[in-house]
Amino acid sequence: MVKLAFGSVGDSFSVTSIKAYVAEFIATLLFVFAGVGSAIAFGQLTNGGALDPAGLVAIAVAHALALFVGVSVAANTSGGHLNPAVTFGLAVGGHITVLTGLFYWVAQLLGASVACLLLRFVTHGKAIPTHGVSGGTTELEGVVFEIVITFALVYTVYATAADPKKGSLGTIAPIAIGFIVGANILAAGPFSGGSMNPARSFGPAVAAADFAGNWVYWVGPLIGGGLAGLVYGDVFIGGSYQQVADQDYA
């Protein structure tokens, strides 16, 4: 059952909430800077060569490590979402209000965009790689890929961070979240690009002024994140969690 709560303007503009938005902006900026930067670095080291297995592994590891750090540094302030699909999945389960979640989205998208604009500046205007489905993969297939891998990501967030029964498992949440993202990039990278994160795809699109196919990385991740929130919230949390009221974020 969907547990969306709209929330109040007062709560969404409280000092605590504003600190959370700043934390999301900074953490998303750091994550995207390292993730996209690793792809640019691969191109620099290979003189623009095609992505090979070693390059894919390196980029996946860079994303996993950067997300681990990003979630860790923001967790105590904002919950460490760094991803509109994660925020949406948590909103579906009643862990963050819709209004506060929208401001999380703004912070995440701004952080990703600033990261990519900074990369463009510090690399002397090098092309910013954007997400896109590979040749032989249709956009519909890309959407399905993104649904599945984002479901895995948000399900992991629920199991390790949002579930009130998590206990000591919560201490490894950033590691588990980073690992699943790295693994999913290895699995889906050659096909859909392995985004799982609308902000991660939006930032490069802004810097490159190229939004071709960007819808894939909104539709797929939001469906996957929402489904994970529904499934985990109803099946494994059920009535043991009170719907968000005064609490604004996970």
Curated annotation (Swiss-Prot):
Domain of life the protein comes from: Eukaryota
A Pfam family this chain is assigned to: MIP
Record motif NPA 1, residues: 83-85
Xref: InterPro entries: Aquaporin-like (IPR023271), Aquaporin_transptr (IPR034294), MIP (IPR000425), MIP_CS (IPR022357)
Disulfide bonds: none
UniProt motif NPA 2: location: 197-199
Main subcellular localisation: membrane
Annotated GO CC locations: membrane; plant-type vacuole membrane; protein storage vacuole membrane
Keyword Cell membrane appears in the UniProt entry: no
Any GO BP: water transport
TM regions (residue ranges): 22-42, 54-74, 97-119, 142-162, 169-189, 218-238
Protein name, UniProt field: Aquaporin TIP2-2
Highest classification ranks of the organism: Eukaryota, Viridiplantae, Streptophyta, Embryophyta, Tracheophyta
Gene designation per UniProt: TIP2-2
